[in-house]
Amino acid sequence: MTVKTAKPKVLVVDDERVIADTLAIILNQNGFDASAVYTGTAAVERARSVKPDLIISDVIMPDMNGIEAAINIRRLLPGCKILLFSGQAATADLLESARAQGHEFEILAKPVHPQDLLAKLRG
């Protein structure tokens, strides 16, 4: 009898739908159970219901930025790993504000190459 191990659940968050959907597809093809949402608010709601192992989120989004969403999700799921990515220079100010409040997040620069992301997740 073979015992199946659960795939790590990943939530991808980006207001650029093509990026979120593409990353979710790549992750699903590489042994993860990934889904995508397109707003920070949707990320918090989905995290509450799905309880992902990992969240990969853009920082700059129109309704709730990725750092605000990450802080809210950390309150709900303290053990959830959160990886942020952004191509915006404004991200530094947001990260500094989060650090001042006692929150630390790992950040990757956009564009994120899929192989680099997979290596980071597996490493």
Mark where each language-model region is.
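Two-component/phosphorelay signaling modules centered on CheY-like receiver
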Residues: 17-35, 102-105
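Active-site beta3 strand of CheY-like receiver
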Residues: 50-56
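Non-catalytic signal-transmission and effector/linker regions of two-component phosphorelay proteins
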Residues: 1-9, 113-123
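Alpha4 helix (beta4-alpha4-beta5 surface) of REC/receiver domains from two-component response regulators
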Residues: 68, 72, 81, 89-109, ...
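Receiver (REC) domain active-site loop signature in two-component systems and cognate sites
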Residues: 61
